[in-house]
Amino acid sequence: SNNYLTSISIPTSTVTIGDNVFYNNRINSIAFNENLESIGNKSFSNNKLEKITLPANLVSIGNEAFANNLLASADLTASIENVGTKAFENNLIASVKFSTTMEIIHEGVFRNNKLKSIDIPANISEIGSFAFSINKLQDLEIPNSLLILGEGSFAFNEIDEVDFHDAIERIGPYAFYGNKLQMVKIPQKINTIEEHSFANND
């Protein structure tokens, strides 16, 4: 990182971008090639990115890869199987589209953004700690596939209603802390509801 880069174009021969490659610059424009399959940890963290178009063959996005930018949206509908922890933390993301090949939404992926609604696909079985905390979420539909909600996963939003399906096994601590919940439907067979899961709602 040199704090001077503002625009980059990834060559067609590049399949993998390693860790920290463009960390902490002033990049506001990226042209990805269609052969790119993997983006490393913190590769584009701490830049000025407002928009990105991820290539169709992309499979993996590393931890904090796009954290601390100015992104307004995230389209993860390519071939993406894994999005690392805090990959899009601290942006301005108001809309997100998920891949149907993802099974886990990891820790802090969209923490501290501007999301008002999300469509969680039916293949997601686990949502990690603080994955969607500190957003503007109002509407939330829990898919039948969801088994585990991590700590603080939806804390500090504006959610007013949650309806869990029978498959849910664990609701982590502080999962819905600091929302606007008026109604919660919890199935009888749930194994674990941890401390402060629904605390501090008004």
What are these regions (language model features)?
Residues 18-21, 40-43, 62-65, 84-87, ...:
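Consensus positions within tandem repeat domains that build extended binding/scaffold surfaces
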Residues 2-16, 26-38, 48-60, 70-82, ...:
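Structural signature of tandem-repeat unit edges
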